């Protein structure tokens, strides 16, 4: 009996040795799983905390360094040619520099005489350091012209031009000061690299370099009501006549075509004036 019990005890101890690792593995498996889940939970909490901290810092972070310029790669949608340079942007923000000084500066004054050709005058001075060509443009070329119609001015040179206009008879017995005119004059300028003779084609050939100096609006003055503007107009017209005579004398010895603006009398004005005078005469005869 004792042998049997000892044998069974020894067998139990032997089997116990073999069973011990399995028991330890079974008992340690939940512990490893628990440690893994705790590590995963800890890492997720840490990652979430870092993400929240990064978002919080990025919201309140302000960059105080030099501006970052994005490079243009081959796959960039916008080409470098379409991006304006800093110099072109700066030029677009700056006001246009005038080459000419005008007197009057924005309006052309005419005496209001219906059915007649009237005149105005304007002084033009080159205030730049280069030779400048100028020319007139008008919205009604059939009833207006300028003399001279254009010229090239040296730096500091001044010229006085005469502007001719036919005044339409009033409609519905409108008073002179109520007569509105939609006629406008535009003065264009072109910087010349080298002095040359004036030709109107210059403005078409170099249209990308042409500048608009001023758009002049027409204002009528009552010749029967003396005022400062009317007196100034008379003085400028007398000066323009003297300058015109000087140009004519200077061009008498020139063989070839006359200067631009000379002798450009529009026959349509004569026809309108004759019709207007005929209407006036018809009214007098009827009376």
From Swiss-Prot:
Q: Which GO cellular component terms, listed alphabetically, does the Swiss-Prot or TrEMBL entry include? A: endoplasmic reticulum membrane
Q: Where is the composition biased (Basic and acidic residues)?
A: 1-14
Domain MSP intervals: 99-221
Please indicate which superkingdom the organism of origin belongs to.
Eukaryota
Name the segments for region: Disordered: 1-45
Gene3D superfamilies on file? Immunoglobulins
SUPFAM superfamilies xref list: PapD-like (SSF49354)
- Low complexity bias (residue ranges): 25-45
| Listed name of the protein | Vesicle-associated protein 4-3
What organism, scientifically named, is this protein from? Arabidopsis thaliana (Mouse-ear cress)
């Amino acid at each position: 009996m004792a042998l049997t019990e000892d044998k069974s005890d020894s067998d139990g101890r032997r089997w116990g040795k073999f069973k011990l690792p399995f028991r330890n593995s079974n008992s340690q498996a939940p512990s490893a799983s628990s440690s893994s889940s705790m590590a995963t939970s800890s890492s997720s909490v840490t990652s979430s905390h870092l993400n929240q901290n990064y978002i919080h810092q990025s919201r309140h972070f302000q960059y105080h360094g030099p501006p970052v310029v994005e490079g243009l790669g081959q796959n960039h949608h916008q080409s470098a040619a379409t991006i304006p340079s800093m110099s072109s942007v700066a030029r677009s923000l700056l006001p246009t520099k005038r080459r000419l000084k005008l007197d009057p500066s924005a309006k052309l004054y005419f005496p209001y005489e219906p059915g007649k050709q009237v005149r105005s005058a304007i002084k033009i001075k080159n205030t730049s350091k280069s030779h400048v060509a100028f020319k007139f443009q008008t919205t009604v070329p059939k009833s207006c012209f300028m003399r001279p119609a254009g010229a090239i001015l040296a730096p500091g040179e001044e010229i006085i031009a005469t502007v001719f206009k036919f005044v339409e008879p009033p409609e519905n017995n409108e008073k002179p000061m109520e007569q509105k005119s939609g006629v406008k004059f535009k003065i264009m300028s072109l910087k010349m690299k080298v002095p040359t003779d004036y030709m109107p084609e210059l403005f078409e050939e170099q249209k990308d370099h042409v500048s608009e100096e001023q758009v002049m609006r027409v204002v009528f003055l009552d010749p029967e009501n003396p005022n400062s503007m009317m007196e100034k107009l008379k003085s400028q017209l007398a000066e323009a006549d003297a300058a015109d005579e000087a140009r004519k004398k200077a061009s008498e010895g020139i063989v070839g075509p006359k200067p631009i603006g000379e002798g450009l009398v529009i026959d349509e004005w004569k026809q309108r004036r004759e019709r207007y005078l005929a209407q006036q005469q018809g009214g007098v005869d009827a009376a």
